[in-house]
Design a protein with these regions (language model features):
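Sec-dependent signal peptide cleavage junction
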Residues: 21-42
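Right-handed parallel beta-helix/beta-solenoid
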Residues: 36-91
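N-terminal extracellular ligand-recognition/capping segment immediately after the signal peptide
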Residues: 78-79, 89-100, 104-139, 144-159, ...
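Short glycine/acidic-rich loop motifs that flank beta-strands on beta-rich extracellular proteins
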Residues: 118, 150-157, 177-182, 285-287, ...
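Parallel beta-helix/beta-solenoid
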Residues: 136, 143, 153, 158, ...
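Ser/Thr/Gly-rich low-complexity blocks that favor extended beta-strand/coil architectures
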Residues: 176, 182, 198-249, 392-428
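Small/polar beta-strand repeat architecture
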Residues: 234-285, 422-465, 473
Length: 661
């Protein structure tokens, strides 16, 4: 029976004294007790998690199969939800579970509504909606423009790991309180490294005991920094400072003691009047969307305003991921950072490609996007056609063609196709496997164990990835970190990033090779100001080189088939484009416009090339608005082989610098 009674309430006070109200969900009205909450006025700030009483635990494991109509399960918002902060967590979890159990069901939110949700076991949950072990195969969630607000700012939102064919669209996600706290320095004792901060009224995170628990531990030699400590960030400054302790001294002021290891930095940068943010460092593994070990995934028209850690994470995915019109931006009412401690998008070791279009990443503390494939360790060589391997770095399948690499030098030992995969030591083959090859790799020495050889599956490394019409701006990290195969980045904009706009590098923790890479018709302005002085100006806004951006001599050139064309580089801090350990590189039809004098950033050049071969630089325009470039094109003669420089236009003081040593 569908009830259609209407309730007229003259005021919020009247609403709160009513003993019961009608709640509307799944198209029917259900009698429920009114939640008892303390609702402060807007002048008194936002409501904290401690003021919310969860009264709907009986809805935690409901089966709403009988509410499905024409393949759609609709979750409607309570009429009083904006005032009562009704916790929809149990209802949404039950609705998702019902949709999973009824294949093909679409879960729809009410259009343009607001849903508050808490996890089952706060603060111990990793996600508000935990379905990582449900092995989902087919799920569609349509937000219809609604806003989902997480009541616990220390956890993520959706964990859909081990899933396939999942689509989420047209939904905004926020937290009631951001995963950081913001304020203004009102006093600073440089000798004691103690500051007083007047907090913005919207922030109440200092009241949460979980933050206090994440401060440093006490050891025999006194207080030491813990890697999980919160840390301070200063607006428009690249340094951060670890926090040892804090205490509230009034309703609006806190006193913060900084870690002595960062004291030498604070003397130069922290001043009274500075705007600072206290970041919850421990939540690096907390993401709004978690798609580890997953297949086909689609996210469309999603806005993320705040995240305790990062935005979207995936590991060892075997299917494609499509991201369209994803926005990770700060809510201007709640502070300056969108993602608290981790990357906007972080996908590693994926067999599938990533298609990303029309996305915006703004004011992220870490990188906007990481896509990379790792080498896997060969734990023991049994024979020229058989070895034991750690396979957690990338999902292997029979028929894959893999390379065996010598770590350190990057030397290619050999290539072969996988004939068979067998479980190793009782583990799944995507954790550890005995790898049988179709043909022998004769240079692989039998009997050697961990650390001598790595395997690499480059032909299944994000092959076919496309990133188009996206904007990356005002972040403290990098724009794109890519170690992939067959990737196109086109018509994107990179503005005012502390680090590189794009980085591809040979690195033990963030991938190894960038192959068949096209970077075309992009605009880059004012990036890389964090690293401009540590590398003598040779670190580029676009940087493709070896570990830690070094330009080292190597017989094996890691990156290959690189095209940089039709881009506009403006106002770069030290270098626009850095190329190292690359082969078959084309730099064509770009515009380089340097606006800073050389004495500002030690050594200014537009293009820097080292330890590479088969490089063509042609039909580019180099313009220096201020004199003093050390060479628009700068390269090392001893390590660059077969370089062609032709048909370029130079409107600068020095066109070319060849380093002889």
């Amino acid at each position: 029976m569908v009830l259609k009674e209407k309730i007229f309430v003259g005021s919020l006070a009247a609403l709160l004294v009513i003993s019961s109200v009608f709640t509307v969900f799944f198209g029917i009205r259900v009698w429920k007790p009114a939640p008892m909450v303390d609702i402060p006025s807007a002048e008194e700030g936002t409501v904290t998690l401690s003021s919310i009483k969860e009264t709907e635990t009986d809805y935690e494991n409901q089966d709403f199969s009988d509410k499905i109509k024409d393949g759609v399960l609709t979750l409607e918002a309570c009429g009083a939800e904006k005032d009562s902060l009704y916790n929809y967590g149990p209802l949404i979890r039950s609705a998702i579970r019902t949709a999973i159990q009824n294949a093909g069901t679409v879960l729809e939110f009410q259009a343009d509504a607001t849903y508050y949700a808490a996890p089952v076991d706060s603060p111990n949950s990793a996600a508000t909606f935990e379905f990582g072990e449900d092995e989902i195969d087919g799920l569609t969630i349509k937000g219809n423009g609604s806003r989902l607000i997480l009541l616990d700012n220390f956890v993520g939102c959706f964990n859909f790991s081990n899933s396939n064919n999942v689509t989420v669209e047209n939904l905004s996600i926020d937290t009631l309180e951001p995963p950081n706290a913001q304020g203004t320095v009102t006093a600073f004792d440089k000798e004691k490294q103690v500051m007083t901060v007047e907090t913005d009224r919207v922030y109440t995170m200092f009241d949460d005991p979980r933050l206090q628990e994440r401060l440093t531990t006490k050891e025999a030699n006194g207080t030491v920094r813990n890697k999980n400590n919160p840390y301070l960030l200063k607006e428009n400054c690249t340094n951060y400072y670890f926090v040892n302790s804090y205490k509230k001294i009034s309703d609006t002021e806190i006193q913060i003691m900084l870690d002595p290891q960062t004291a030498n930095l604070t003397n130069n940068y922290i001043e009274v009047g500075d705007k600072i943010t206290l970041n919850n460092r421990k939540n690096t593994s907390t993401f709004i969307f978690n798609f580890m070990y997953s297949g086909t995934t689609t996210l469309k028209d999603i806005t993320i305003y705040n995240s305790a850690g990062g935005g979207i994470v995936g590991l060892q995915n075997y299917g494609d991921m499509t991201l369209k019109n994803i926005q990770m931006i700060p809510d201007i009412r709640k502070g300056i950072w969108a993602c608290g401690t981790a990357d906007g998008v972080h996908i590693q070791a994926s067999r599938g490609k990533v298609i990303m279009e029309d996305c915006l990443f703004s004011h992220l503390v870490d990188d906007a996007m990481n896509l990379y494939q790792w080498y896997g360790d060969i734990s023991k060589v049994v024979s020229a056609t058989e070895f034991d391997a750690v396979t957690t770095t990338s999902p292997l399948q029979v028929g894959d063609t893999i390379e065996v690499i010598e770590p350190g030098t990057g030397r290619l030992v050999g290539t072969a196709k996988i004939k068979d995969l067998q479980p190793l030591n009782g583990q799944r083959v995507d954790r550890a496997a005995k790898v049988i090859l179709e043909t022998p790799i004769s240079d692989m020495q039998t009997g050697v164990e961990t650390g001598r050889y790595y395997w690499y599956n480059k032909d299944k490394s994000f092959v076919g990835t496309e990133i188009r019409n996206c904007t990356f701006q005002y972040g403290r990290g990098r724009g794109l970190v890519l170690c992939t195969t067959d990737t196109v980045v086109e018509n994107c904009t990179f503005t005012s990033l502390s680090n590189q706009a794009v980085q591809g590098w040979f690195n033990g923790t963030e991938g190894y090779e960038l192959q068949n890479f096209v970077f075309r018709n992009n605009t880059l302005t004012g990036c890389n100001y964090l690293t401009r002085e540590v590398d003598n100006g040779q670190n580029g806004m676009v940087q493709i080189s070896t570990n830690n951006n070094a330009y080292v001599q190597s017989t094996y050139l890691t990156h290959s088939k690189i095209e940089i064309s039709g881009n506009k580089f403006t106002d770069y801090h030290g270098c626009a484009l850095g190329i190292g350990n690359c082969r078959d590189v084309t730099i064509k039809n770009n515009v380089f416009n340097q606006k800073e004098a050389a004495n500002v950033y030690k050594k200014n050049n537009s293009v820097y090339i080292s330890n590479s071969q088969d490089v063509t630089v042609e039909d580019n325009r180099f313009q220096d608005d201020k004199p003093g470039l050390t060479g628009a094109i700068r390269y090392r003669a001893a390590s660059v082989r077969n370089i062609v420089i032709q048909n370029n236009t130079f409107a600068c003081e020095q066109a070319l610098e060849i380093i002889k040593e």
